[in-house]
Amino acid sequence: MDGDFSLFTGGQGGRKAVRNPFEEAFGTRPVPARPLDRGMGEAVGRRTVFRPSDREDFGRVADRVAAGNAGLLTTVGDAEIMQLRNAIATGALLTSGRHLQHGDSTQPDRNMEMFTNCATAICSFAKFYLLLNGSGVGRAYDDELCVVDWGQAPDLKFVLSLDHPDYPHDRASLLRFGLEMQILPWGTAQEAFDAEIEAQVRAFLERTVLARAPEGDELLHVIEDSREGWGKAVETIEAMAFRGERDRTLVLDFSAIRCAGSPIAGMQGRPASGPVSLLRGLLNVREHVIEAARAGDMPLWEQALRVDHYLSVEVQVGGARRAARMATKSWRDADVLRFIRAKEEGGLWTANHSVMVDAEFWDYVNDHAKADPLASHARTVFAEATRCAWINGEPGFINGDRLEDNRTGSARLKQVHADGRDFRSHRYQATEGAALLADLAQRATSAHFPVTTNPCGEITLHVTGGYCVIGDFAPLLACPVAPEDVTPGQVPAETAAVWDARVRDSVRLGVRFLLRANRMDALYGEEVRRTNRIGIGPTGLHEWAWVRFGLDFRDLLDEERAAPFWNAVRELSTIAKSEADAYAHETGTARPITVTTVKPAGTTSKLFGLTEGAHLPARRQYLRWVQFKGVRREDGTWEAGTDPLLPTYERKGYPVRSLRSFPGMSIVGFPTVPLIQRLGMGERVVTAPEASPEEQYRWLELLEKYWIGAEQGNQVSYTLKVYTDRHSLDSFRAMVAANQPHVRCCAVLPSRPDSGLGYEYLPEEEVSAGKFAAITAMIQDDEVREVVDWAHLQCASGVCPI
């Protein structure tokens, strides 16, 4: 086995004048771009990355992304730009889906939120605005961090002009309005929409929507046709609730919002959802939170949780943004059991729920000799959380005391500002909500958990707000020759030298890339300047370990046997942190509080068929099912309005099925083989269902030790499936209690084998090798393009929104 991996080789001279950290392994002339993985990779590229001007050439993507990022700092030289371009073009530096999608020469003039994967927020208007910008958002719902009583909000009235294209006048538009407002059962057809039902919809419309603003003392707010306008509307309501202005009336006019279906320029022309979507969200807030809080005893944290849910539903239903959320709550809160049961009771499906815990919590759980009231509370929390998680996978546990900013105390150094600067950029400025932000910032200084995580768990962020500025590097794809042509663990010395240098340079280039992104105009500009936080991490680790070092998953769990691999990982971590510190110093910015992470890497990894982040391959071979509009009639013909791709795929031999649970929709199955299955591993491939939970926890501990490191580290995002046909609830609890205290975070997801889940179909269906071969033999296709839908991008590592 060739295990040499040198930290300092080449490119280390000439630092006295202008420091050049690179080994120039990527060269300073353009290199050919790596083709995307056939099938899934190409489909994801078309769905999320390519623009018409890219002509489906990843090299053109690399050109614009490198140019846009380099434009953030005038001192970036041409040589670095070309090396950055080549690292991206080869796939060695994948950055993130956000950069690949949005990066171009306009980046210096755009807002940072379009380029950040995730964030945190301390109040609902901030969370909503970030979601509208495409961020996933985490929020802490600790009692000490929830202060707004939505029962004290003003009375809300809604206006939509009769002249607006989306105002319903005729029967067809009234039917659509009734369906969108959920007055009518989904799927109600035109022929069933009789005069009586139409009258019900008209009555609802007259009760809830005014055609013009009333005259009088009411406060009128015209909602602007922009993300900023929608965010400001919620800010106005939330700020008035914080001030206790229940006796006032706020009139919200939706008439300036563009009609549904209009293109959104900043989202590659994707269709706008129109005013009815926001109207529906605010109606739900009025009825299910404001009025409910006035009528009953709804705690403040639950009010906030429900407001955030109803607003994020509208972001997700719009279809152009993902609306991923993380909701956390301290185990110490007296009402945490209600939070734990919230998902079990149904309805709150837009957020992943986790309980923030610490070493004291685990001591109480694991030491039954302790019998004080807090110990009893901890054990009750653990028992109830694991009972609920055993049923639906939530809540999880996050070890808040192990998160970097809490561990070091840096989170408590954040200053409190009363002028709204904590949420201010050129595009959006918090005005009405400034006092609320200041109040919450002051509370956070003494909060037990001043930091939380983003929805995927890989970045530590202050509870009052911060960003995930993150990117992936793929060490396998830094190989200067086709990995399939390399004998695993026996890499020729010349090839190994270039390969290793490229890996090192991809880390250096990636760190600098992310630190430049921190220079963008940002809502959380104060926090970005304070922390200069980034997160760079590897993806395709299992493929790299196999081809470069000849090691499979179980080899990696043996530190002695896998020493060459783990030494390489540790040295890359050192490079990342050293380069981050040096580049921050050179550019006059703060030393980054965090540098290393491992993110889920779903989109970026799929482009090239890699295992995602730290995850094991989910399956050896599978059918990827994608929904299309249209069904076949009994006579064998396709219904009018059927997507023309459906009959095309069927003629080519792809499996096609009509759905019962989604009327009017059919699915097409695309045979998929991950890259790791094409590298000669054979039976040495270990899939996630084949690895024991203890093995996977050990893998996470090693990644935290060697890559995350003792300082300047975030977390490893990881979903560990525990199959309920192999483990009982008691063994599940024992496994969590024994292992979860020793990692920063890990999503443990009880599940059943695909065949036992009871769904009509799953986005990815594992099939036997024989069945897979039979299916592929039936397909005659050299031309038809595959597609991908949101289900596959959101199911990156097994956490599916089903």
Residue ranges with predicted function:
Residues M1-I802:
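Extended catalytic cores of very large enzyme megasubunits
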